[in-house]
Amino acid sequence: MNAITPRITIDGDDMDFIEGQYESPGNLGSASLTFHLPLSYAGDKKLWNKEVLFYFNKQDSSPMFRGWIRRTKVDLNQVEVFAQDALSYAVKDGGTSIAQLHLSEQDNLDGLSASAAIKEAIKRCKLTDKLGILGNTSPVVSSVRPPYRGTIQLLELIKSLLSKAVLNTSTIPRPNIARLIDNGNKSLLLIELQADLDNGPVVHTYTELNNILNINIVNRRLPSVVIVNGKGGVAGTFSHDTAISAFDRNYLTVTNDSLESPAECLDFAQKLFKANEAVQYEYGIETLEGAYLVENDVIRVETDDPKFAGNFRVIGKKVNFSPSSFSIGLNINRKPPTLAEYISSRDN
């Protein structure tokens, strides 16, 4: 394996770690860092909730991971440390109370853009010391319709606001996504359009002969019945008899408030089915290249079978490392943008 010089700090102090693993699932899931320290670091909870930074190379100006220690485990030889990033405060597996806020008729987020509403929600959840926001949706959408009321989990609010913004100016609609970045001082939730596989720049190319150690290909189940809900209660349903015969009834339901008639909803549903039909493969790649790839980057995979080759989006990443070696795992797919996990839907 190639030599690297990874670095881990806890509250600014460099750690003499033994080995570790960084894992980011993507799709607004919380990234984690698990690493092992010599037994001399053991102590009764003395590491809990301290800030951890992981640099893939010690020369990097910004960390690959910024998070907080959730738990430690001591055995006879070492201490295992588990940390999660800022999104862990908003997800169920965060090891802490889930961030939420209460909105009423008198105190709410009405009239704010999606970005401004998310920023205010983060402030109300008292997470501004751990999480900021950068960018806005394209097109810009408001938090007015429908109005948000009651007790709402922060992550569900973010997903709901993002699902309202779909850029429908091309053959395949493109939604907005959010992912964590680091500016060297703080984690930021970056809002951006999901990458265009056909026209976006290819960041890296993988081939079976040169830089792929192992590859797993998954043939996804296609949605055979697509239901699209539009504005003011209009809706359209598209079903495909051949797909139903092959995959049974696999439902997909999405909402697009820019559609104002049943005909527009039906046309949108047909686009979703056709997009799924053409790109139903997902990959898991083991490699030694691509440590700095991030979610939404476009890469190209070249295989002997052309139906498995083409451009893919990076979804998640795993890096196993020690002071002198590393390996990388990438999760990539061509799942049509409007089927992303940011829209509350079922697509597998």
Per-region residue spans from a language model:
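Beta-strand-rich assembly/attachment modules of structural machines
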Residues: 1-114
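Acidic, small/polar-enriched beta strand-loop surface segments
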Residues: 1-2, 107, 159, 163, ...
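Short, solvent-exposed secondary-structure boundary motifs
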Residues: 4-16, 57-63, 157-173, 205-209, ...
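Intrinsically disordered, low-complexity segments enriched in small/polar residues
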Residues: 10, 18, 24-27, 41, ...
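A broad, structure-centric signal for solvent-exposed, well-ordered loop/edge residues
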Residues: 15-17, 24-30, 76, 90, ...
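Oligomerization/assembly interface segments of phage tail-like spikes and tubes
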Residues: 23-41, 77-89, 228, 257, ...
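Short beta-strand and beta-hairpin "edge-sheet" elements
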Residues: 56-84, 172, 299-331
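Charged- and aromatic-enriched interaction segments used to assemble
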Residues: 75-78, 82-217
